[in-house]
Amino acid sequence: MKEELFKEKSRYITGFVLIIVADLILYADNLLLFWAVLGGIYAVGFSEALRLFQVKASFSLYLILVLSWVAAYFNGRPIECALISAMVMASVIAYQKAHHSEAILPFLYPGVGFFALFGVYKDFGAVAIIWLLVVVVASDVGAFFGGKLLGKTPFTPTSPNKTLEGALIGVVLASVLGSFVGMGKLSGGFFMALFFSFLIALVAVFGDLYESYLKRKVGIKDSGKILPGHGGVLDRLDSMLFGALGLHALLYFLEIWKETAVFLGD
């Protein structure tokens, strides 16, 4: 009983600290600061992914990680750096016998998600990150309490504790709350923000499911222990990483559509 109470207390304290830190970083609204902090988080998440994919850590893995993250700061399209890092790792695997083919996987997950998250901030600003946070948190909270109150139907065999009813409630709540945050110039209006929030929430659900699948596959409860009461970095950011990729893609194509419409109008 004492152990459970301590865990819950640690969970709330850690959650409060994370909210404060996130608020300060977004309030500062500084590209270099965001890049540096997110890079450190990426390094921790990458280490956790090595464990999930059962890949042995090596100098070449972390060298590629560091160089690709530095390149992302100067590159106009950070996600390209994630894909290049995966290609470089594939080349290393092909050249050396020291690495198994699984060594490429951490560059895809969580790699692509972290680069997408940085891309969202770099291309669309702090308001886009806040929008993403609201959608993901609302989806998680809605799914948790909705599942507790109304959940009956298991959502998937890979995560039997999650229910279909909870997931649907989470997506609906995230869509509604997210639409009010994203309804400004970023999306072009309420209905577009509602549609985007719905898609992001939907994608975020599968980020959570994928992380659960990986943990069950290797027989562990948490991806790490760095966050007391919460587990690892990937335990907290799994939905966020999938959602970031979805949001960046949606906003990117929306910009292209707007530019095309202006061009055709001229």
From Swiss-Prot:
GO terms of molecular function: phosphatidate cytidylyltransferase activity
Catalytic activity: a 1,2-diacyl-sn-glycero-3-phosphate + CTP + H(+) = a CDP-1,2-diacyl-sn-glycerol + diphosphate
Cell compartments where the protein resides: Cell inner membrane
Pathway info: Phospholipid metabolism; CDP-diacylglycerol biosynthesis; CDP-diacylglycerol from sn-glycerol 3-phosphate: step 3/3
Membrane topology classification: Multi-pass membrane protein
Any one of the GO CC terms: plasma membrane
GO biological process: CDP-diacylglycerol biosynthetic process
Highest taxon, organism lineage: Bacteria
Enzyme class: transferase
Keywords attached to this entry: Cell inner membrane, Cell membrane, Lipid biosynthesis, Lipid metabolism, Membrane, Nucleotidyltransferase, Phospholipid biosynthesis, Phospholipid metabolism, Transferase, Transmembrane, Transmembrane helix
Ranges that cross the membrane: 16-36, 52-72, 78-98, 101-121, 125-145, 164-184, 186-206, 237-257
EC number: 2.7.7.41
One Pfam family in the UniProt entry: CTP_transf_1
InterPro entries: PC_trans (IPR000374)
Keyword Electron transport: no
Protein family membership: Belongs to the CDS family.
Protein name per its UniProtKB record: Phosphatidate cytidylyltransferase
Provenance organism: Helicobacter pylori (strain ATCC 700392 / 26695) (Campylobacter pylori)
